[in-house]
Amino acid sequence: MAKTIIVKQVRSAARRPAVQTAVLKGLGLNKMHRTRELEDTPSIRGMVAKIPHLVEIIEERG
């Protein structure tokens, strides 16, 4: 079983640079307070690290 993380969007993407909006879209997040369970890979961790002010990691499983 692969390790997973649960990511929650805590701030809006409105009036943010296009790069940050694209990262949110890549994570599957598009509205505030939505959560996604994602595979814990270096690429996902890198995406989360680019927008720490917009998302938070709620839980790490595995």
UniProtKB/Swiss-Prot annotation:
Pfam families: Ribosomal_L30. One of its GO terms (biological process) is translation. InterPro entries: Ribo_uL30_ferredoxin-like_sf, Ribosomal_uL30_bac-type, Ribosomal_uL30_ferredoxin-like. Coiled coil: none annotated. Gene3D superfamilies: Ribosomal protein L30, ferredoxin-like fold domain (3.30.1390.20). It comes from the Bacteria. One of its GO terms (molecular function) is structural constituent of ribosome. Keywords: Ribonucleoprotein, Ribosomal protein. One of its GO terms (cellular component) is cytosolic large ribosomal subunit. PANTHER family: LARGE RIBOSOMAL SUBUNIT PROTEIN UL30M (PTHR15892:SF2), MITOCHONDRIAL RIBOSOMAL PROTEIN L30 (PTHR15892). Belongs to the universal ribosomal protein uL30 family. HAMAP family: Ribosomal_uL30_B (MF_01371_B). Part of the 50S ribosomal subunit. NCBIfam families: rpmD_bact. This is Large ribosomal subunit protein uL30. The lineage of its organism: Bacteria, Pseudomonadati, Pseudomonadota, Alphaproteobacteria, Rhodobacterales.
